[in-house]
Regions:
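Juxtamembrane loop-to-helix connectors within ABC transporter transmembrane domains
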Residues: 9-10, 18, 86, 90-94, ...
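Helix-loop-helix
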Residues: 55-61, 66-67, 160-174, 248-317, ...
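Hydrophobic alpha-helical transmembrane segments of ABC transporter permease domains
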Residues: 30, 38-42, 82, 130-175, ...
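An intracellular "coupling" helix at the cytosolic face of ABC transporter transmembrane type-1 domains
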Residues: 23, 114-115, 131-140, 144, ...
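Short intracellular "coupling" helices and adjacent cytoplasmic loop segments at the cytosolic face
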Residues: 2-4, 95, 102-127, 131-133, ...
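Transmembrane helix-loop-helix hairpins at lipid-water interfaces of multipass membrane proteins
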Residues: 25-82, 162-167, 278-282
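Alpha-helical transmembrane segments of multi-pass membrane proteins
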Residues: 30-31, 75-94, 145-152, 173-197, ...
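ABC-type nucleotide-binding domain
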Residues: 332, 338-587
Length: 587
């Protein structure tokens, strides 16, 4: 995510978001043009009054003064209407673009492989979806508007002033590109500092998220002071980054102030000289002073917006960084939709290594599971049990070999169709913030309330749900914090019951539960497994004694397979694992 993009590339990628808002943008720029012209006309009126009064005070008639007053009022009315549109509709356009970008980035993230979430901190991802895009609203509105206003003021004032005195005008305007050059160089440093600042905000978000989610662990170890120290360290680092940014911003302001002084000095010295020799008059001098003030105010306004612009550009850059992340698991053009799935699964010489590692987790693994068969996979930690459960729904792509469902390579099946036919119950249950009903119906969005009730009953969750104050409408808190471990697991099982998939993966589904909860959940899982092809990743080996077949996975591959009785009679690896597991449970 650390690729560097040029400004031109960022603008090229960002411009399409103006697409459906071009009418709004054009009208916004027209209003900006009217507002700018109103500002440019006032100095001309004052120049006319000054020269007229200097020439002959009798020419300043009441009619002339009233006429100029009416013109000024009309200009102010036009300016007010134009500014209302710019401030109201223009800002809404920026918010609409921000909304479109947030929709696109969230949709894109949903399509990224499971590996993306394992290699990127959730705080960083969250920061890019939310905080980074907040500043795009102002950027999308003010960037074209302020640039357009600056161009109009430069061009129109140049045309007007060049017709008054060529030398003085060129002397002043030749400083502008020099000023832009120096300001651009400091601008690049500001953007780098701004990007580093955003990255660190993501780190802080990740730290805060970890602290909040791990609040129970923090308090159980009485490590509140340690957490505060860790946060303080990161917070001070953020302050250092802000200091660096403001140092570059101060350099930016210094450049502006230097050229501000030089341009005023030029008008005062050279303008006074030309007045003395009769090349310009007092009205012209007044006009030059007002226009120079206007031009410098335009530059100053851009300077004032520069931090905002940098935040917007950084937000766009970090947005594009995620949008450029490619999904390495995509459907083929002719990918199939699974129908009438029996549930036969076959691993053919499957090898797998994680994307950021050359070490193979699985090496040349082959086995088959027949329709409706209940297969258990056991082994010590780190041999690849959970990896197998992640490969079947294609959360990761196999490095070598193939996985077949009903004789079809899963790479030839549409991912949605594949996963629609697989139910997964994990050790770490994730329940969404919301009600019990909302969490169960997540398994099948078009399910009726009766279907949800039936699923809850089959999962052994119905009785405890009905004891809750709001029953199915009970709010369960963030990640189901208001429920016990066993209750959360039964809700997740009900979700799979509702989905009713032909293939079921149980990834250490009861290993984190106490004995009482495990017994209840195990009973629900046995009901759930009936008639389905079931792969059980087991930690507590006593729960898989009734499996059709047990595969013993080691670093050398599948070293043993058979029923519980067959493997116990062999007195091999499984025999030792089982007895060790029983001894641990007794302790």
């Amino acid at each position: 995510m650390q690729k560097t993009y040029t400004n031109s590339y960022l603008f090229k990628r960002f411009l399409p978001y103006y697409g459906k808002y071009y009418p709004t943008l054009i009208l916004d720029l027209i209003c900006a043009g009217f507002s700018t012209m109103c500002d440019l006309v006032l100095p001309i009126i004052l120049r006319y009054l000054t020269n007229t009064a200097r020439q002959d005070l009798s020419l300043l008639t009441v009619k002339l003064i009233l006429t100029l007053g009416v013109i000024f009022v009309l200009l102010r009315v036009v300016d007010t209407i134009a500014n209302y549109y710019m401030q109201n509709i223009g800002h809404v356009m920026g918010a609409q673009i921000e909304t479109d970008m947030r929709y696109d980035i969230f949709s894109h993230i949903q399509q990224l492989p499971y590996s993306y979430y394992n290699t990127n901190k959730s705080g960083q991802i969250l920061s890019r979806i939310t905080t980074d895009l907040f500043d795009v609203t102002e950027f999308a509105h003010h960037c074209p508007e302020e640039f357009f206003i600056a161009v109009v003021k430069l061009v129109v004032s140049f045309v007007i002033l060049i017709n008054i005195n060529i030398t003085l005008t060129l002397t002043i305007f030749i400083m502008i590109p020099i000023m832009v050059f120096f300001m651009s160089s400091t601008n690049n440093h500001m953007r780098k500092a701004q990007k580093e600042q955003r990255n660190h905000v993501g780190e802080i978000n990740s730290g805060i998220e970890n602290n909040i989610l791990g609040a129970k662990v923090v308090k159980s170890f009485a490590n509140e002071e340690l957490e505060v120290k860790k946060f303080h360290k990161e917070n001070l680092r953020f302050l250092d980054i802000k200091r660096e940014f403001y140092k570059h911003m101060s350099n930016f302001q210094v450049v502006y102030r230097i050229f501000d002084g030089i341009m005023y000095l030029t008008v005062i010295v050279l303008g006074s000289y030309y007045m003395k020799v009769g090349k310009i008059n007092a009205g012209d001098m007044f006009l030059y002073t007002l226009y120079i003030n206007m031009l410098l105010n335009t530059v100053k306004k851009i300077v004032d917006y520069m931090e905002q612009f940098q935040r917007g550009m950084t937000g766009i850059e970090r947005f594009i960084e995620i949008m450029d992340v490619k999904n390495d698991i995509v459907d083929k053009e002719n990918a199939k939709v699974l129908t009438d799935v029996s549930g036969d699964i076959e691993f053919e010489n499957v090898s797998f290594a994680y994307p950021d590692s050359d070490a193979k987790v699985l090496d040349d693994i082959s086995f088959s599971i027949n329709k409706g068969e209940n297969i258990a996979i056991v082994g010590s930690s780190g041999v690849g049990k959970t990896t197998i459960s992640n490969l079947i729904p294609r959360f990761y792509e196999v490095t070598e070999g193939a996985i077949l469902i009903d004789g079809t390579d899963i790479r030839d099946i549409k991912q949605k169709s594949l996963r629609d036919n697989i139910g997964i119950v994990q050790q770490e249950v994730y329940l969404f913030s919301g009600t019990i009903y909302e969490n169960i119906v997540y398994g099948k969005k078009n399910a009726s309330f009766e279907d949800v009730e039936k699923a809850a009953k089959m999962a052994g969750a119905y009785d405890f749900i009905m004891e809750l104050p709001d029953k199915f409408d009970t709010y369960i808190g963030e990640r189901g914090t208001k429920l016990s471990g066993g209750q959360k697991q039964r809700i997740s099982i009900a979700r799979v019951f509702l989905k009713n998939p032909p293939i079921l993966i149980l990834d250490e589904a009861t290993s984190a539960l106490d004995n009482n909860s495990e017994a209840i959940v195990q009973q629900s899982l046995e009901i759930l497994s009936k008639g389905r092809t079931t792969i059980t990743i087991a930690h507590r080996l006593s729960t898989i004694r009734n499996a059709s077949k047990i595969l013993v996975l080691t670093e050398n591959g599948i070293e043993e397979s058979g029923t519980h009785e067959e493997l116990m009679n062999k007195e091999g690896i499984y025999f030792n694992l089982y007895n060790k597991n029983i001894d641990e449970l007794k302790e």
